[in-house]
């Protein structure tokens, strides 16, 4: 009952001091909004690919300046090095805005080509279909949830045919959750890598001439580490891969999947800047500190008026403990109100 009376009295005080209320609540709310937005962004950035079940065993093959290679390279490395359990070359960001047709609808789609083991290799969620069979045949395709809704609406897309750029038809065998929070870019359609030649003649299972389109992912056997053998891999590459034969590329670098997004060596996938994230986190902390100091300064500015009120209440019989609890309830209420407003502001911005 006393707490309710305290809150009621505090609301009267805020009503009498509208300028103080607006500056204090609005200032703290806006500051908390920025802190919330920065926190959401930094958490998202720092959690990229952390959901990958085998992330500690997956590496991307790179050279000094790029996380790129030829389509067959991953398979050649698997044949030679027993440390490798399986491989999954991925071609992304090379076939964006391709025209597709289905159910008399014509749309643009982002295509991605990968090894048939894609869903056993990575931990991307399949909403329908068997991860061991969805890419079993050359003309199989897995469609993203968002693109399935755009193209087929409420109809079940599995078993439906999609025509791509007048030349190729594929059958939808599965629906996957949208790829996000990963170094691997979002894609509308995931196709088998064996079919990439139909869209680009320089790419193929036996074609090395296009060296900048593919990301070769290697999964090591438990406990195995191929990184000490990178010099040997570079020497081996000279036997069959022209950039190494011509000494345009000299080194082989194996980048762990968990570090790929923030790697200074970029490729065809998504990437981030860890220094920017750290700077942004620092800015968020500074904003929070300034907000707290601003709140304290405004509270101190009202100290004289509040001291008279507290003295009057002390004379009327309130104990020190009751006055302390009153101030705590007031401060907590103001902070909670500001946080709720800051959260609503942040939701409005993100929406």
Can you name each region flagged by the protein language model?
Residues 1-20, 52, 224-227, 232-284, ...:
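Membrane-helix entry/capping segments
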Residues 4-23, 27, 293-334:
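Intracellular coupling helices
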Residues 14, 24, 45, 61, ...:
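Generic structural signal for small/hydrophobic residues in well-ordered secondary structure
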Residues 17-44:
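Short, strongly hydrophobic transmembrane alpha-helices
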Residues 37, 253, 332-351:
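Small-residue-rich transmembrane alpha-helices
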Residues 38-97, 112, 205-217, 230-232, ...:
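Membrane-proximal extracellular/periplasmic loop immediately following the first transmembrane helix
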Residues 112-128, 141-272:
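Mid-to-C-terminal secondary-structure elements
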Residues 277-297:
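Selective detector of the "anchor" transmembrane alpha-helix that sits immediately C-terminal
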